[in-house]
């Protein structure tokens, strides 16, 4: 298998703490760059776990169309500002951040007080502007998740009248682009490829971490296929017919024929179906007359047995 290497040739951090990285992966066999690029991009854009603000509580507010006295932004603007916060929670549980500010004040993300499990990445992002003589009290809920989660107004846990839910975007990767370049021709004339991948994150994780997490997800996805064992299906035994379940007594055979069959451990029609005419004649004290009697009794219920073993 062709060995390739991964080089990060570029890494930048924007003013809002978003990060971008460019990676070169190669050399690869023809077609492998497309396979890797598509698979990694799909996981990067929708399969990684991230953190987001999922709900907000504002003192004195019970719906999103309200205004807060002394605050320049209305509640909808505050909700939007909180939705755009970039946070990184290391806890699997709900984390709650709080803020109490007296004006005049320019409230920013860095003013929020969380536990040590939560990091606010873009601390300079504005939240609200409080005028002199007024105050603002906020409570933010932060959770971890995957992909996009719309507001669920029927959830009893989050349906408190003063808890304003937010559509949560948990995706830490905001953009992925890749291109494929042909490299030198290998021995035998086959061209090699190189995958150039650009990954942009919101700053809650680095591009290197995003690439590693997506690769590990793909490994977990494909690993069971490497050890798959095909189990041969055993055909199910056919269900015996109702006629086969008829006990020997119900065939109304003569006493002689009945006793001979019983001594031969024949107890039902199902047992008789394993015999041929020749087999019946080999039963001790079982002559052709008794054999003919059995054949006729079986024919009355629609069952026939072969004349000889070879024709079975």
Swiss-Prot record:
EC number: 2.7.7.6
One family name in Pfam for this protein: RNA_pol_L
Region annotation (Alpha C-terminal domain (alpha-CTD)) ranges: 239-312
InterPro entries: DNA-dir_RNA_pol_insert (IPR011262), DNA-dir_RNA_pol_RpoA/D/Rpb3 (IPR011263), DNA-dir_RpoA (IPR011773), RBP11-like (IPR036603), RNAP_asu_C (IPR011260), RNApol_insert_sf (IPR036643)
Origin organism lineage: Bacteria, Bacillati, Cyanobacteriota, Cyanophyceae, Synechococcales
Keywords of the record: DNA-directed RNA polymerase, Nucleotidyltransferase, Transcription, Transferase
GO terms of biological process kind: DNA-templated transcription
Protein name according to UniProt: DNA-directed RNA polymerase subunit alpha
Region listing for Alpha N-terminal domain (alpha-NTD), in residue ranges: 1-229
Assembly and oligomerization: In cyanobacteria the RNAP catalytic core is composed of 2 alpha, 1 beta, 1 beta', 1 gamma and 1 omega subunit. When a sigma factor is associated with the core the holoenzyme is formed, which can initiate transcription.
Enzyme class: transferase
Free-text function comment from the UniProt entry: DNA-dependent RNA polymerase catalyzes the transcription of DNA into RNA using the four ribonucleoside triphosphates as substrates.
Catalytic activity, reaction form: RNA(n) + a ribonucleoside 5'-triphosphate = RNA(n+1) + diphosphate
Organism: Synechococcus sp. (strain CC9605)
Record family assignment: Belongs to the RNA polymerase alpha chain family.
Matches recorded under SMART domains: RPOLD
Molecular function via GO: DNA binding; DNA-directed RNA polymerase activity; protein dimerization activity
UniProt note: domains: The N-terminal domain is essential for RNAP assembly and basal transcription, whereas the C-terminal domain is involved in interaction with transcriptional regulators and with upstream promoter elements.
Gene Ontology cellular component annotations, sorted alphabetically: cytoplasm; DNA-directed RNA polymerase complex
């Amino acid at each position: 298998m062709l060995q390739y290497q991964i080089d990060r040739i570029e890494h930048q951090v924007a003013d809002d703490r978003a990060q971008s990285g460019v990676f070169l992966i190669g050399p690869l066999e023809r077609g492998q760059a497309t396979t890797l690029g598509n698979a990694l991009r799909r996981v990067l854009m929708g399969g990684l776990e991230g953190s987001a603000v999922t709900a907000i509580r504002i003192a004195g507010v019970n719906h999103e169309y309200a205004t807060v006295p002394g605050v320049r932004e209305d509640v909808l603007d505050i909700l939007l500002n909180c939705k755009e916060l970039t946070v990184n929670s290391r806890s699997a549980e709900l984390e709650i951040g709080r803020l109490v500010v007296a004006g005049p004040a320019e409230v920013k993300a860095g003013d929020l007080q969380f536990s040590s499990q939560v990091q606010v990445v873009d601390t300079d992002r504005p939240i609200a502007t409080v005028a002199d003589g007024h105050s603002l009290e906020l409570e933010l809920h932060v959770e971890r998740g995957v992909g996009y989660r719309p507001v669920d107004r029927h959830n009893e846990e989050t349906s408190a009248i003063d808890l304003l839910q937010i559509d949560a975007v948990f995706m830490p990767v905001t953009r992925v682009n890749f291109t494929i370049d042909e490299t030198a021709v290998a021995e035998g004339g086959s061209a090699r490829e190189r995958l150039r991948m650009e990954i942009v994150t919101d700053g809650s994780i680095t591009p290197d971490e995003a690439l590693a997490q997506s690769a590990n997800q793909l490994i977990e996805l494909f690993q069971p296929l490497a050890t798959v064992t095909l189990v041969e299906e055993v055909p199910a035994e056919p269900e015996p017919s109702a006629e086969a379940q008829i006990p020997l007594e119900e065939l109304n055979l003569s006493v002689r024929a009945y006793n001979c069959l019983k001594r031969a451990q024949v107890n039902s029609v199902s047992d008789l179906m394993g015999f041929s005419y020749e087999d019946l004649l080999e039963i001790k004290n079982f002559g052709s007359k008794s054999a003919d009697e059995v054949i006729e009794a079986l024919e009355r219920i629609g069952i026939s047995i072969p004349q000889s073993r070879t024709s079975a």
